[in-house]
Amino acid sequence: MPLPRGFVQPCLPTKALEPPSGEGWLHEIKHDGFRVIARKDGKRVWLYSRPGNDLTYRFPLIVESLAKLRSRSCIIDGEAVACEGNGMPSFDRIRYRRHDASVFLYAFDLIELNGDDLRREALDTRKATLASVLRRAAPGLRFNEHIEADGPTVFAHACKMGLEGIVSKRKTSTYRSGRSPDWLKSKNPACEAVRREEEEDWGR
């Protein structure tokens, strides 16, 4: 089955035995949600799942917010996340509600902007451009912040907070579809989301 027009197969992290330490890495929280490739062309917006299925109808707030971006066109990689009242991500909420207006896109990479392919740019450059694109964005879009610190320390804090884990990325890495050794995921074994992902292969 052919992939949809404008869909880019996402870059996927490789499972790590332990988080990387040392310089040259960005560490992001691993959210418990749906991986989304978002494409905007003028006022039209499409949302695709990791394998390329159409998710556009499911997340109206994300679609509305993307349509309001000032950029003419873009392709953004991120995670659609629903949060409970305590601020913690809720996968069940996002999975079982067919139309949820309270799901946000945590954007962590910019693949294309106004017709320019950014995949050969370094990650830290792409993220800086993404932050600029999302400045004053509508409520459905959130820039996924990163931390430049010791990986094991960041991971330990994420586990204490009950989060799913972290994704560590080389600052100089380019964006390439499929599994990448430059993106490493470290998962909290005590987290229910991790056990579910092992069984069902959701998320990133």
What kind of region is each of these model predictions?
Residues 1-204:
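Catalytic cores of nucleic-acid ligases and guanylyltransferases
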